[in-house]
């Protein structure tokens, strides 16, 4: 089996996502509340094993020395699961808010104080949703130095993370799809 380098994997991911028409044109409301003339519909793509395989390899190779892989619900959970399986690092799932029943946990999984955590997300615009997950990890004793996103919309998330002292690493940016 041929080992692919990072650039080959990136090209493969662009091709897979382009074939699935993940960038849709029209009028959309984003999770940030903003209007947009395009939408990055990655949810369907991350249900495909071939897509998850490429994503997991790219993130696991770039994550370096971490103790846990985390993903905010719902969109990032399949991504975090794939990276966890590929890297053999335990998984954390971050809820949007605490449950009002059962254990009332915000974080599912075994997060220990001082654990180094790589956080993954499907799409970022401003980075607000992902930063909320990062803060939940930090408030529970985890250390986040790197976060990964499959597609960055290039609307400020990378800079916002930089201000927080965290490196946000987009696997792809929306400009990678502008030819479509």
From Swiss-Prot:
PANTHER family: OROTATE PHOSPHORIBOSYLTRANSFERASE, URIDINE 5'-MONOPHOSPHATE SYNTHASE. Orotate binds at residues 125, 153. Its EC number is 2.4.2.10. This is Orotate phosphoribosyltransferase. It comes from Methanothermobacter thermautotrophicus (strain ATCC 29096 / DSM 1053 / JCM 10044 / NBRC 100330 / Delta H) (Methanobacterium thermoautotrophicum). GO terms for biological process: 'de novo' UMP biosynthetic process; pyrimidine nucleobase biosynthetic process. NCBIfam families: pyrE (TIGR00336). Its cofactor is Mg(2+). HAMAP family: PyrE (MF_01208). InterPro entries: OPRT (IPR023031), Or_phspho_trans_dom (IPR004467), PRibTrfase_dom (IPR000836), PRTase-like (IPR029057). Homodimer. GO terms for molecular function: magnesium ion binding; orotate phosphoribosyltransferase activity. Pathway: Pyrimidine metabolism; UMP biosynthesis via de novo pathway; UMP from orotate: step 1/2. Catalyzes the transfer of a ribosyl phosphate group from 5-phosphoribose 1-diphosphate to orotate, leading to the formation of orotidine monophosphate (OMP). Belongs to the purine/pyrimidine phosphoribosyltransferase family. PyrE subfamily. 5-phospho-alpha-D-ribose 1-diphosphate binds at residues 95-96, 99, 121-129. It holds the Pfam family Pribosyltran.
